[in-house]
Every structure is written in structure tokens, then in C-alpha cells.
């Protein structure tokens, strides 16, 4: 892995230098093997980019470049530049959430400054041939932060009330809560409506595609 960048500009320059390169070229330099597809290797693209950019946090709650206060997010896009899938932000806390505020939340920390790296995501393009796009450094506008905060507070209120099982992907305008587990056996603790502990699937916060589409549109229009 390349050493961690020491400044925001160094990170941005690195990201600009890999723009236009294919996954095959980037994997070759990193000594990584390109999988046939991403069905069993969902995190492969992120790991490839982390290697080239010197990210250190992995999937821990901290930002990928904690010393710079920057989170790295790859975003698969279509031929027309639209996001093809929702963007995972972080795992949602299901216990010990009484009194937790938006300002203290992992979601706000992760999204305070994001280095977005668009990547070709159309399924018919072989993975090795897909290319990395031009990066953008983004922080939420006051309006975007207000949207995120409102959704986060609505979802967290349902968790606090023991209604986690009633939350669907339809909740939230820009931020949604969905099960996040490699299989249905990976259960975690939460609270039921009667306040007693229950076992449920881990949940993750995800950004809706219309939200990330607006970010991309504003920067690349």
C-alpha cells in the first residue's frame, strides 16, 4: 500500500493521477488479482482505491483518512453518469443510543468531507476494463446536512422506540436504513417495542441514489 497522504492536496493529486486508468492497470501495480465479478468481492474496488490512495481506516468507524478528516467513497456510475446503487455510509448503532445526537453520530463524521471517486459500473463492461473517473471533494451544504440530519433523527427515534423491525427502505428522503449482513445468521442485539433485548440483522445507513446523483450533477455539469 502507498503511504498515507500528509495533506488534502496530496490526496486529491493522487486521486487525479489514477483517473482514466483501468482496474486491470491499477490492480497490476498493487499486485492484486481482478476477480471475475463483484458478487463475492463487493469491497474489492474500495480496497483497490485504498491501496493507491494510502487509506488506513478500512471498515472501522473512523474516516478513511482520519488525520485529514476525509472519507473515501467509490461510486459506480452508468454510461450517463448516474449512480447505479446506494452508497453505504456506516453501520447503525442499535443499542446504547439514548441521548445520541446528530453532531456526535458516525454518519455525520463520515459525511463531513468525502472524496468521491466515480467508477464505471455497467455490468456488461468486464471488471478489468472498467475505468476510474475524475475525483471530487465534497462537504454537505447546509441544505444537504439538514436533510441528512432530519432522516437520521427520524430513523434513530424509531430505533430508540424499539421499532427497528418496522423500518423499511422507504423511510428517509436521502438516508435509508437497511439490513447489512453477509448472511441471515449474523444477528446483533437491538431493543424490541417492549424495551427488552431482541436479536436482529445488523443495519447500515445508506445514501439514496437521487442524493448522490445531485452531488455528481452539481460537480460535473
Swiss-Prot record:
GO process annotations (BP): DNA modification; mismatch repair
Superkingdom in the source lineage: Bacteria
SUPFAM superfamilies per record: Restriction endonuclease-like
Alphabetical list of Gene3D superfamilies matching this protein: DNA mismatch repair MutH/Restriction endonuclease, type II
Xref: InterPro entries: DNA_mismatch_repair_MutH, DNA_rep_MutH/RE_typeII_Sau3AI, DNA_rep_MutH/T2_RE_sf, Restrct_endonuc-II-like
Family, similarity comment: Belongs to the MutH family.
Protein name: DNA mismatch repair protein MutH
Name of the gene: mutH
Amino acid at each position: 500500500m502507498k503511504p498515507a497522504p500528509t495533506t488534502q492536496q496530496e490526496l486529491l493529486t493522487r486521486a487525479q493521477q489514477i483517473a482514466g486508468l483501468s482496474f486491470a492497470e491499477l490492480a497490476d501495480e498493487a499486485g492484486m488479482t481482478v476477480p471475475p465479478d463483484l458478487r463475492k468481492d463487493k469491497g474489492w474496488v474500495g480496497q483497490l482505491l485504498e491501496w493507491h490512495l494510502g487509506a488506513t481506516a478500512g471498515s472501522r468507524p473512523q474516516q478513511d483518512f482520519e488525520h485529514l478528516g476525509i472519507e473515501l467513497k467509490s461510486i459506480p456510475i452508468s454510461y450517463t453518469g448516474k449512480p447505479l446503487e446506494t452508497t453505504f455510509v456506516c453501520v447503525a448503532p442499535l443499542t446504547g443510543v439514548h441521548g445520541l445526537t446528530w453532531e456526535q453520530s458516525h454518519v455525520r463524521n463520515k459525511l463531513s468531507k468525502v472524496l468521491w471517486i466515480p467508477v464505471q459500473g455497467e455490468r456488461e463492461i468486464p471488471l478489468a476494463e472498467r475505468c476510474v473517473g475524475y475525483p471530487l471533494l465534497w462537504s454537505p451544504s447546509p441544505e444537504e446536512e439538514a436533510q441528512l440530519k432530519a432522516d437520521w433523527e427520524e430513523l434513530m427515534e424509531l430505533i430508540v422506540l424499539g421499532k427497528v423491525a418496522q423500518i423499511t427502505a422507504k423511510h428517509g428522503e436521502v438516508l435509508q436504513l437497511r439490513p447489512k449482513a453477509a448472511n441471515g445468521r449474523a444477528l446483533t442485539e437491538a431493543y424490541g417495542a417492549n424495551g427488552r433485548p431482541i436479536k436482529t440483522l445488523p443495519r447500515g445507513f445508506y445514501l439514496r441514489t437521487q442524493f448522490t446523483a445531485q452531488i455528481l450533477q452539481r460537480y460535473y455539469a
